[in-house]
Amino acid sequence: ITRESVIRNQFLIDEGDPYNEILANKTLNEIKSLNFFKDVDSKIIDDDVNKTKIINITVEEKPTGEIMAGAGFGTDGEVFEIGVKENNYLGKGLAIDTNLSLGSDKVTGEFNIVNPNYNNSDKLVKFGLRASEADRLSSFGYKSKKIGGLLGTKFEYLEDFKLGIETSSFIEEMETDSTASNRQKKQEGNYFDTYISFDFDYDKRNQKYQTSDGFRSYYSVDLPIISDNNTVTNFYNYKIFNELYENNISSISLSLSSANSITGDDVKLSERLYIPQKKLRGFAKGKVGPVDGTDYIGGNYYAVINLSSTLPQVLSNNQNIDLGTFLDVGNIWGVDDSSLDESSELRSSIGLGVDWFTPVGPLSFSFAHPITKGKNDKTETFRFNLGTTF
């Protein structure tokens, strides 16, 4: 059962403040955006004796645990993912998340704890542990192991503007064999890296839950404190929402990222950039961009534009299914050896997405058709994810 303090922390109105209907409605939406409740309702009561208004909030609890399983099928094999997440641990609003991804040559595990209101300070605090192992000795001549953790906080610095600060440390071991390229052999050895990260989040969306208007601008930078390669990573995303017609939600998103060494060293394989699969649908995860032999090594830069629009008039009688279209356009380029550059090859895809809320949990499908691609890119026309709650 959710603690009352968790609900009260979402209020944008304090006791004794003049009543503001706009803030009252935003408060209701903030509670809904927690995704802890099946139903949220409010009732305003006039207290004629004290000349005040009483806001009564009624909520209906729902399961907040999730078990997620996902799989992808494409031209380059399969990827399986499984995760367990509790979004409201002990009713305190704490999020505990574990995730395991099993690929044909890589295993990644994560454990994260997020407290959105640490010690009633209105500051988010998070802690995480991560480990990964990429075994590509038989195919590409190298193997890497990486383990470490992070600690960070995020808080509202100005109205609608949040500042995040995070520190992370990782130990990495990389080994190669005779089949590895010279670039990979140069990176063989042990590494210890400590970074400090900053993120700046300007959020002018009308609501976090089912956003239909407004925009969000987000920038983050990772700066090396202790590092052998001294890589600086930048990321920027801008997304704007609009309702083109009744019940429709359309959005345009721009994402930019870069990774470069400030001391002129080669960027480590594990720090190179890959376009996130959710931003370039229709392509296999990590199988886009510069190739060293037969190994996809990522790039120093990427840029992606995403256009999406819901289709509320289709299956309008079924409240459990959301249907939408999308167009993804992106490019990834730049390597420390310019002979491998693929900056001229633009990738794009068009497709259909389906979110189906079934009795066993949310089920999502993605059908994508690549329009343009690089000569070495691997495609993935269909992907699904299945989750359940507890």
Show where each model-derived region lies:
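Gram-negative/organellar outer-membrane beta-barrel architecture
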Residues: 20-218, 231, 242, 248-250, ...
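Extracytoplasmic gating/loop element in the C-terminal half of outer-membrane beta-barrel translocons
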Residues: 53, 246-326, 334
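Strand-loop-strand
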Residues: 87, 343-350, 354-358
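Acidic, glycine-rich loop-and-beta core segments that form the ion-binding/anion-interacting portion
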Residues: 217-259
